[in-house]
């Protein structure tokens, strides 16, 4: 239970968290730019324009199907259209009321065709979030359709339930004072937006997302949304450019511009959610494994294989989220290294999304891993193009000697590398034992 003392303690620690918050935002901004966030927002804007009518039709139909929510339908409509078009909500609502009534007259095939645009919107949003969360594989089609249907049906019910609870709270507060009611009504849109964004970041990406990270991203997106509403309204009022150019049709570009703003805010909130685990892991996460030195790549790969071997002893695999926790080098590095190890046939992903080792680590060596990751000196160095100078043969001799030395030193099997020292035995004695078993001289 959150007591007043704990709340005061959290508030006292808040100023100390500001540098971290600034750092997360500074990390998220270039991440958003590199992921082409504005271009994706533009694409989602036009897809949303086509999908809104069937989406709103289903949403309001669900409200009508539950008599208890019937009286809340108008409140829900007001909240939805205020979020969709804060400055021209009345005009947009009038248009969509007409569109929704026209959609009711469609035949079965027409309804199916119209509904496909809603499915395409969901797939587009899923693809955008998968890019942000570095999910390389989409869900199976059946799972995707079921997730879409769950979001489409559950969200209106949650909205209705929250409005019902809020109405009861407002009724109780009216007896105590007007200020409390005003504050609650002012905060309600932002709270609902934060809840919706949090669920979106949790449910849609094909990636395990911690609820705390999704909550932080949802709150950040909701705050940006409320600030954007105010700024958008002030801009439209102060600079009536669209009304001057388009006249009565100005509602169309204004509505498109606002949808573009909404999707930019949503995608940036998703970037913050995806950035948090990377930020906790440290600065190394700003690059993928290709940005690391060779020795660092090998260390990350060996750390992943070590965790997979430990899990294999229990007969289980490890999910990516667990790996990111146990090997805290950041999501980018973990994802990239898993892809490289999978391409080299060292690991594989199971149907339930867990990762397992596919090679017998008792026989495999560090040198095998080095070659699989492309870090060895390969190729015929004595014949490169038309080069045939004497220095070329001498350089080839040096490379061959270096490769032979590396092969000798790194020919340690993972069973020996991962061996725990017996109780009371220093790690140096274990190193000596490894040398004796493998016949190596010098340091490992």
From Swiss-Prot:
Residues spanning the signal sequence: none
Gene Ontology CC annotations of this record: plasma membrane
Mode of membrane association: Multi-pass membrane protein
Short name of one Pfam family: Virul_fac_BrkB
The UniProt record lists the keyword Transferase: no
Keyword Membrane assigned: yes
This protein's UniProt keywords: Cell inner membrane, Cell membrane, Membrane, Transmembrane, Transmembrane helix
Region (Disordered): 423-444
Transmembrane stretches, start-end: 49-69, 103-123, 145-165, 186-206, 219-239, 248-268
Protein location: Cell inner membrane
Major subcellular location class: membrane
Entry similarity comment: Belongs to the UPF0761 family.
Official protein name in the record: UPF0761 membrane protein RC1_0578
Source organism of this protein record: Rhodospirillum centenum (strain ATCC 51521 / SW)
């Amino acid at each position: 239970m959150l007591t007043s003392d704990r709340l005061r303690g959290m508030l006292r620690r808040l100023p100390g968290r500001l540098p971290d918050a600034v750092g997360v935002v500074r990390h998220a901004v270039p991440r958003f730019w590199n992921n082409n966030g504005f271009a994706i927002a533009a694409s989602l804007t036009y897809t949303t324009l086509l999908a809104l009518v069937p989406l709103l039709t289903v949403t309001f139909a669900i409200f009508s199907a539950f008599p208890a929510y019937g009286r809340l339908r108008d409140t829900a409509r007001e909240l939805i259209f205020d979020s969709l078009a804060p400055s021209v909500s009345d005009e947009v609502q009038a248009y969509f009321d007409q569109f929704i009534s026209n959609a009711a007259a469609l035949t079965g095939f027409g309804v199916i065709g119209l509904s496909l645009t809603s499915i395409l919107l969901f797939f587009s949003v899923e693809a955008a979030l998968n890019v942000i969360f570095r999910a390389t594989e989409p869900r199976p089609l059946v799972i995707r359709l079921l997730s879409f249907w769950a979001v489409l049906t559950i969200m209106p019910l949650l909205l209705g339930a929250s409005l019902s609870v809020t109405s009861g709270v407002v009724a109780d507060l009216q007896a105590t004072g007007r200020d409390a009611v005003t504050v609650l009504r002012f905060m309600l849109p932002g709270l609902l937006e934060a809840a919706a964004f949090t669920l979106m970041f949790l449910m849609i990406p094909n990636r395990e997302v911690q609820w705390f990270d999704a909550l932080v991203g949802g709150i950040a997106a909701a705050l940006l949304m409320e600030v954007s509403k105010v700024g958008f309204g002030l801009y439209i009022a102060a600079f009536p450019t669209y009304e001057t150019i388009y006249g009565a049709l100005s509602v169309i570009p204004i509505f498109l511009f606002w949808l573009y703003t909404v999707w930019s805010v949503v995608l940036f909130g998703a970037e913050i959610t995806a950035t948090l685990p990377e930020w906790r892991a440290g600065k190394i996460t700003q690059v993928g494994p290709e940005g690391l030195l060779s020795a660092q790549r090998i260390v990350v790969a060996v750390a992943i294989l070590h965790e997979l071997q430990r899990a294999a002893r229990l007969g289980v695999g490890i999910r990516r989220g667990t790996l990111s926790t146990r090997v805290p080098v950041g999501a980018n590095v973990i994802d990239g290294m898993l892809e490289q190890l999978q391409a080299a046939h060292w690991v594989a992903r199971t149907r339930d999304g867990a990762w397992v080792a596919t090679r017998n680590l008792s026989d495999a060596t560090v040198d095998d891993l080095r070659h699989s990751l492309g870090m060895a000196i390969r190729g015929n160095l004595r014949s490169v193009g038309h080069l045939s100078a004497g220095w070329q043969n001498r350089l080839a001799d040096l490379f061959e000697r270096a490769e032979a030395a590396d092969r000798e030193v790194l020919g340690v099997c993972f069973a020996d590398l991962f061996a725990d020292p017996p109780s009371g035995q220093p790690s140096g004695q274990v190193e000596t034992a490894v040398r004796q078993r493998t016949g190596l001289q010098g340091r490992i």
